[in-house]
């Protein structure tokens, strides 16, 4: 027997063909959401408050300080929030201290700071009753970046940019004349020496002393001449910078100093963030810049006078490591004191080293480092600017390297916590201005924190983010896999990110640093390709937001691959050589072969085993969760694998789903972490279990109660239904499944079914990827799904009186009311068809001038006889089904309703949809098709043992698409079915062709795994042997029921009076310009005239035509289309006197604008009137017309 048995949870064993020992379990797959939010609650929120506060008033006599904050209990539970369309949020209370500096008086007070949405255990938020997800954003990391560009003459120029988290950009660039310039905040460029002089180093010699001799420095100094001798060089430089930043304003050195301080050196206005400081220090660090250079001076320990490194030594990694302490300490540190006119007058500490130029061995190049400012320094320092300039000048000397912006060391993830902190900061900054004004205006003695704080800007910022940000998305809830994928999504779009139109090919492309961090397969097709990605299965964020991936460490001394796991970012990985997970190992953990396949900085090649530093932990660390669910992924073309991964996320939950015979072993973990199942929180014993709830007695005696969700409507209209898995008496461990969620079976993801599939053509019905299906799959509800739709009706107060929910509806027979209760609301369990009343509702009509008789009736019977019109909620087209639930909300019951609404009724209708012709089906390998024919079981081809085939696919769909994985799955699936086992074949480590044929033979199948098939209609065998097997097929969310649409009479557009378009508006089919040409070409003038008049916008014509058809009279001639009248009115509005004349030169009267207009938006009323008129004439008000 090939393979070995593996247990997945308590309910499923699979035969696994993996050969690689897994040394690391998959992390919790939604930790990117939950950990980030927890960090925000624990520390992120506190940091935001500490950033903005304390706030002083303008005279600095009062100060508002932050003390702490506390979250109280949420107002609603999760379930209540869903039912009431509320948000699941907790009130936050913040303690402030108001200090009066003149009197020393201190007032401390707790202030309510609004309701803050709280993340559920599943990593989602409930906002206004809907489940939402905050997608993590992939953005360019703050830091310093260097780039090179070649001009049209082939000359290489260099550029550099310091990008902060917030604040102004500082850029450097060279031109064709070898002069270096700087730009501040995208303004016009100035020589870089101007900025150096503004920083207080004004002499030419001083500048050369800092940066060393080079052509760029000399050329720039020559260009930067002293124009105004009455100013000092520093003042002149400051004025020049001010002129660039504020053109047209009077320039003084003082205003320029304060402007530059505000732009770069004030931590409130300029923020590199922790990650930016880390990146700047890492890039400008002297150790990486000295690596492999030849030192041109003796390095001497200042304290002892000992020579650490002699001139002429190559600074290899080992040399640098030997003097690392000195490099991090005071080795070659120089203190430069700026002159008195400088922007910042504190002394500037730099580290300077001289090395031999790599281009010209006779020249010496100076390397200037920023002496590693502390991590807490979030603004730029003059040392940073000088060190950046030095690196930039060194690039022209062949030192240092330019940055690749698409490298994942330069792109980071902003997860939920950080996005929320940014929003909160924006709100607090708006609040700060408000607070400062109130503190200054009001009387100091009576002020309390409560009085000066207005929380509205903060709550508005948070609300806006959750409600309308591009990154706050309605959760994709088609099935558990789509939930899980959505929570792990990484988007490069959104505020502060890229835009679709500007993103080029490079940003979207797969980069070598994506390995183990972002999935190279799973991304949408279309305009967002490559901009929306998914986290790889083992990906994990570090504290700076860079994605790490785990590797097994290789002990270089013994050559053994240890089980020690090291998490590396893309930057760190660049320094090492990493071997693949499938490298053969001996029993003792050493490499079995001298040469192994490995990667180093994007080069995939063979390496000697002795130079390998790390080994991948698992073959599936390259791909995302959805991709890791595709068996035989290694045999599929990547374009089709992309479709396969995306289509699994569109699978509809079936009534009785089955886990795949051929899985990958990911099904258990994906189901477990998705949040759709019920998972035990503690160990214990089941003491009660039914469909609605499970009770578990813990070992300490306390009782856990788990509620099972039954048929709740999911975000995408499918049934979210959980099924209990445990019985009374079962022993449960923490993490065990208590109930399956939708699309799960026995604790495993089960998106579809395992039908018997044959690759063969049949009467041409599977042309172009169409799917032929057996009627068995319809009759036995194999691909049946339940869909829930929600309809609501509300009663409001109108000017003419309140609307009412009632059974007494005008002009409706008793038959139509048979399923309504005494209030006029449909009963639960009623079967409804389109047009049936769900909630009876009447709205008062405008009173006409009453006749004497009517006034008398009013006086006698009170208000009863006034006119009302029927505004009942009816079942829309395609909405028939069974009433699953009715919820009623009224003010009397204490429900919160919108203003003006007295009562809200919600009706849920369940539909059972069997699979039918036109539904879309797919396998897991990107093989998708539409059901073209459902064939009776007796006509389907059958196997020699009499088993009819369930599905026939077109064999031509395989070769050109190069997704051979489906054929391998087919054969292995048949073997698994015959053996009665389930199989796991993990990606890149699955069943080999030998394993496949061994299993086929073990199952007693023919050696080619094909079989003779017999035609069900004739009983004759088909000419050739056919590949028949079991393939996992899923039904996708694109169902024909949602797309089929027909209209006879419906709403019209208000201005043009043409039918609306689209299924949602119950619109008509557009007969466009080209279609008109077709009828013109055939000379079909009458048909064309009908289409352009009656069937479109001839208002009176269509009424008369309707009347004529219902009475059986000849149809009258059409009139003038409404759109023509609109045209006439447009021309008249331009001042042109446009009239329409008939053939006898008499003016044709056009319908006037106000004629017959109602206050309704859409015009179906005219037709209704015609119907009523006809009904009165014939006087046959029978039950049957009532029912309709």
UniProtKB/Swiss-Prot annotation:
Cysteine pairs bridged by disulfides in the record: none
Enzyme class, first EC level, given as a word: transferase
Its EC number(s): 2.7.7.6
A Pfam family this chain is assigned to: RNA_pol_Rpb2_7
GO molecular-function term, one example from the UniProt record: ribonucleoside binding
Biological processes per GO annotation: DNA-templated transcription
Catalytic activity entry: RNA(n) + a ribonucleoside 5'-triphosphate = RNA(n+1) + diphosphate
Family matches, as InterPro entries: DNA-dir_RNA_pol_bsu_ext_1_sf, DNA-dir_RNA_pol_bsu_external_1, DNA-dir_RNA_pol_su2, DNA-dir_RNAP_su2_dom, DNA-dir_RNAP_su2_hyb_sf, RNA_pol_bsu_bac, RNA_pol_bsu_CS, RNA_pol_bsu_protrusion
Secretion signal, residue range per the UniProt entry: none
Record keywords, A-Z: DNA-directed RNA polymerase, Nucleotidyltransferase, Transcription, Transferase
GO CC, alphabetical: DNA-directed RNA polymerase complex
Task of the protein: DNA-dependent RNA polymerase catalyzes the transcription of DNA into RNA using the four ribonucleoside triphosphates as substrates.
Family statement drawn from the similarity comment of this UniProt entry: Belongs to the RNA polymerase beta chain family.
Subunit details: The RNAP catalytic core consists of 2 alpha, 1 beta, 1 beta' and 1 omega subunit. When a sigma factor is associated with the core the holoenzyme is formed, which can initiate transcription.
PANTHER family, per the entry: DNA-DIRECTED RNA POLYMERASE I SUBUNIT 2 (PTHR20856)
Protein name: DNA-directed RNA polymerase subunit beta
Lineage of origin: Bacteria, Bacillati, Bacillota, Bacilli, Lactobacillales
